[in-house]
A protein has these predicted regions:
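Core segments of small alpha/beta cavity-forming domains
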Residues: 31-93, 247-249
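Hydrophobic/aromatic beta-strand elements that line small-molecule binding cavities or substrate pockets
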Residues: 103-110, 146-152, 322
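...with weaker cross-activation on analogous glycine-rich loops/strands in unrelated enzymes
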Residues: 264-334
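Low-complexity, Gly/Ser/Thr/Pro-rich intrinsically disordered linker/tail segments
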Residues: 334-340, 348-365
Length: 365
């Protein structure tokens, strides 16, 4: 009897211990999941609200998403303010209007606790725009960005204290010196272009660019680069590497001793933007259509066709390469690239600073 009582007491004690130790942890774990879901949903809502604010010119809505009591919060807000103004300026120059900005967000990591969190995410943003004199024709392009967000909860709302991402518009905050009216008039006088007779090699180049333009590609491709090649974004940039891939994998240009990629690495003409531009021109594989400021070359840009490329020059140095992948409803050339990933984006969008010069280059397939 005594032995039976001891066993009963032991069992009751074990049950109490299980309730005491296991149940609280379950509740805490559940609370952590709820909190992470809350911060994730709040981050996604911020992106949606910011895009709506850009469309509506609602600067107050953008301002409400930042903690302006911190210098990093102020800087992040001011950057978004400049971005909104630039896009409005570009619309005016182009005779166009953005009608929808749609983000697709993939959360990579969430760290933190209580009221402070850090979020790593990627965002593939679709920009839809029309030309004001032809609103029935909707144009679409995609831009992909990687973000690190620091967020805190204040007065029941999650707001941004710090944000880092490679902004595709950071080199484009000045359109003031452009003769907007004459540029707009010329753009609106153009018509849609027909590329149905494009060669198979050019068509294949465009297909490769569409498939492997990373975060700017379609969701079905997983927002990834071609894993057959190294990603050089963290080592100076991947734009020329991508352009070389497009020409080799898609356009069937053969590698050689000067232009090459293998397991040991890549030549400068394959990997470096300046080296790529120079190699393509001086090897005879490409020829220059035009070179100069936007006002000097924008009319010539209508001679670009899919499979050609644009090189962007700052202070005498080629800093970026984009591949031409199409044209919009007004025949305006569209480009795709790596670094800040772009998919069929107007060739000057994000490159409107007065100090930038453009190389429009025809590739000889």
């Amino acid at each position: 009897m005594k032995h039976s009582l001891i066993k009963r007491v032991f069992r009751i004690t074990m049950v109490i211990l299980v309730i005491f130790f296991v149940c609280p942890f379950k509740n805490i774990h559940g609370e952590e999941i709820d909190e992470k879901n809350e911060i994730i949903n709040s981050a996604k809502q911020i992106f949606e609200d910011r895009n709506k604010a850009i469309l509506n010119g609602n600067l107050k809505l953008i301002e409400s998403k930042y903690d302006k009591n911190t210098k990093y919060g102020i800087w992040a807000y001011e950057h978004e303010e400049k971005k909104m103004k630039y896009l409005k300026n570009w619309e005016e120059k182009q005779g166009a209007k953005f009608i929808e900005i749609i983000p697709d967000i993939v959360i990579k990591r969430v760290r933190g606790s209580d009221d402070k969190f850090s979020i790593n995410l990627i965002c593939s943003t679709e920009y839809k725009y029309i030309y004001k004199d032809a609103p029935k024709f909707i144009n679409s392009c995609r831009i992909g960005t990687s973000h690190i967000l620091n967020m805190v909860k204040k007065d029941g709302r999650w707001i941004i204290t710090k944000e880092w991402y490679k902004d595709p518009f950071e080199d484009s905050l000045n359109l003031d010196n452009l003769k907007v009216d004459s540029v707009k008039q010329y753009i609106l006088s153009q018509s849609k272009r027909d590329f149905s007779s494009m060669t198979d090699r050019r068509r294949s180049s465009v297909e490769y660019a569409d498939r492997y333009c990373g975060i700017a590609s379609e969701k079905k491709y997983g927002y990834t680069y071609n894993k057959k090649y190294r990603n050089y974004n963290s080592r100076g940039g991947d734009c020329a590497n991508f352009a070389s891939q497009v020409l080799h994998e898609g356009g069937k240009f053969r590698k050689n001793s000067a232009w090459n990629y293998d397991r040991s690495g890549a030549t400068s003409s394959w990997l470096n933007a300046d080296g790529f531009k120079n190699y393509m021109i001086y090897s005879g594989r490409a020829s220059v259509i035009a070179h100069g400021s936007y006002e000097k070359v924008y009319k010539a840009s209508y001679r670009l066709i899919p499979g050609d490329f644009v090189a962007y020059e700052k202070k005498g140095d080629i800093t970026h390469i984009s591949v031409v992948t199409g044209a919009d409803s007004r025949g305006y050339s569209l480009v795709s690239c790596h670094n800040t990933d772009r998919n069929r984006v107007p060739w000057d969008l994000g490159w409107s600073d007065k100090n930038i010069k453009f190389w429009l280059v025809h590739v000889n397939y």
